[in-house]
């Protein structure tokens, strides 16, 4: 899969306040893709970010599920360190027809809008 296929999704994820650092991506030979990034666990919106992404990507509704999964990934903590340094998050697509740009559109339609505006996240 061409790197340009990921631009809309990675650009969108970079706007989410709790997501920091670089965003990796790739795809297998069958076209199933993944995007990997870090959520700053000290950010006040860290767990709300996890909740929002988990809701849309893992279980939007009983009748409307996306062919994606959102989950944490980590190397062995005993060999590396704690979650502030080595915990990452990955979005994986299980259907080659579901493209990264389509995923971005689903997130845009369901996460706070504009996603970069802290007030839209309902911070108190």
Listing of model-derived features with the role each one plays in the protein:
Residues 1-124:
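Structured alpha/beta or helical-core interaction and ligand-binding surfaces enriched in interleaved
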């Amino acid at each position: 899969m061409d790197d340009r296929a990921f631009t809309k999704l990675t650009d969108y994820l970079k706007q989410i306040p709790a997501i920091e650092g670089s965003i990796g991506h790739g795809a297998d030979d069958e076209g199933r893709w993944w995007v990997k990034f870090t959520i700053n666990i000290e950010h006040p919106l860290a767990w709300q970010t996890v909740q929002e992404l988990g809701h849309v990507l893992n279980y939007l509704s009983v009748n409307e599920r996306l062919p994606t999964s959102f989950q944490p990934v980590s190397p062995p903590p005993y060999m590396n360190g704690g979650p502030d340094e080595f915990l990452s998050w990955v979005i994986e697509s299980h259907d080659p027809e579901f493209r990264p740009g389509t995923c971005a559109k689903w997130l845009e339609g369901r996460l706070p809008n504009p996603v970069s505006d802290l007030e839209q996240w309902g911070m108190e």
